[in-house]
Amino acid sequence: MRKYWLTRDGNPGLILFMLGWAADHHAVEHLAPEGYDMLCVYDYRTLEPFAAEEFSAYRNVTLFAWSFGVWAAERTCRDVAPDCAVALGGTPYPVDDRFGIPRRVF
């Protein structure tokens, strides 16, 4: 699991991007919301769960998980209590006959 800080200036808010399959920080580097630090997470060959205290300095945390990042967020962000969470185009079951890509296709 790779972590890349796009912004780490001690802002009051954090946007935690759990990026999708084959994506890295370049996918969102054009974003610069005022008042937010931004952490991108990708390359999920190894998973390292986040501890709650990792983000305790922030007044608010927004979790944005996209594609395969939805699966990774479900496994690594269990102790993170975001103020807002968005899962876009993904599932906690990426290879699943009912909720994801059918096993015969994958």
Walk through the language-model features, giving the residues of each.
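Gly/Ala-rich beta-loop-alpha elbow adjacent to hydrolase catalytic centers
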Residues: F64-A73
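Short hydrophobic/aromatic-enriched beta-strand-loop microsegments
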Residues: M38-Y42, D83-L88
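Short hydrophobic segments within beta-strands
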Residues: L16-M18, F64, L88
